[in-house]
């Protein structure tokens, strides 16, 4: 059987109004992913106003309006296919959403398309988004220098902006091999989106669509320690206890000895895997990305709850006593100060957490500490902080197990901040092997 094409999640990033949604919309349009009936309606509308050449702009506006009214023609979640890849465009345009979804999005992005307007060049959010992409471990970047029509498709201006962007990407730690392509284009007119533009004969690199085809699928983190955040614990007649969850890292086989932490048992729930199923079919080995149910001997349904994490007994998950984290503040009605106690969301867990120390404000564009021990943190600021979970929770250092090192902080029904765990002080747990 031919192997299915790899799935790659791509996030579109860049400064507000540099054309992220137009670029995604144009990609859909040129690939025939926008229903003809939708186009027809808009053509009629455009004719009425004598602006037939603006059909595409109308299309985008129409979708924006429909989004505002809550209709589901959402550019945000686009699926498309290239000769080698299935691409899911994970993210909606919009700064706040982007920042939030980098962390809480159902799927972590594997690659990013950085959209930069040729007339404006690198702006504040260009920089901030690029830093966030780097922080969250995105290591493939396509740069699309948009609005070349605004600078008369001038090669000199393209080279200037290209150099600005490359300088920024190198400064924050990207290397040449992380940068797939730097493409001049004008997504409004479809230049170098899917079709090669005839307005820039001086450019002979890939189009955006071709660059998406060049992306490599992420390596499955099979060599990392086993971690399965638990979604549910069931008791099934004739089988016994069944745990369900998505394998984030490592691999699981029948016969493996596992421990589930923090669990209702003070020293963790220990058991042996009897069998594994995915989509009602038995599995000999579960790998990262697999959503599985596995039956265990020695663990009762009541020992385990959603938010606990299963690992191998000889390499147990880390239950955190304290966490030193790098956070980006997204929203707060006033400011975050020491003593603030919102809710930490990580993998399938959410627990109350307290801000113990604000160690230093960080420049979100460079990662440099700009103020030691600040009094308060406001939206738009980044900082290194010390957090204390007020209930037991598993979280891992981002540089060791990134899948369990990203988190969001929520309060009042909103995402207050997102972050990564830099250091985790483990709770002392006596594990009886």
UniProtKB/Swiss-Prot annotation:
Signal peptide range: none
UniProtKB keywords: Cytoplasm, Elongation factor, GTP-binding, Hydrolase, Magnesium, Metal-binding, Nucleotide-binding, Protein biosynthesis
CDD domains per record: EF1_alpha, EF1_alpha_II, EF1_alpha_III
Renumbered residue ranges of the record's region G3: 91-94
Residue ranges annotated for the tr-type G domain, each copy included: 5-220
G4 as annotated region, ranges: 146-149
InterPro entries hit by this protein: EFTu-like_2, G_TR_CS, GTP-eEF1A_C, P-loop_NTPase, Small_GTP-bd, T_Tr_GTP-bd_dom, TRAFAC_GTPase_members, Transl_B-barrel_sf
Enzyme Commission designation: 3.6.5.3
Keyword Repeat recorded: no
GO MF entry, a single one: GTPase activity
Pfam families in the record: GTP-eEF1A_C (PF22594), GTP_EFTU (PF00009), GTP_EFTU_D2 (PF03144)
Organism domain of life: Archaea
G1 as annotated region, ranges: 14-21
Locations listed in the record: Cytoplasm
GO CC annotations, alphabetized: cytoplasm
Gene3D superfamilies attached to this UniProt entry: P-loop containing nucleotide triphosphate hydrolases, Translation factors
Reactions performed catalytically: GTP + H2O = GDP + phosphate + H(+)
Annotated segments matching region G5: 186-188
Binding site for GTP: 14-21, 91-95, 146-149
Described purpose of this protein according to its UniProt entry: GTP hydrolase that promotes the GTP-dependent binding of aminoacyl-tRNA to the A-site of ribosomes during protein biosynthesis.
NCBIfam families assigned: EF-1_alpha, PRK12317.1, small_GTP
Family: Belongs to the TRAFAC class translation factor GTPase superfamily. Classic translation factor GTPase family. EF-Tu/EF-1A subfamily.
Name under which the protein is recorded: Elongation factor 1-alpha
Organism: Nanoarchaeum equitans (strain Kin4-M)
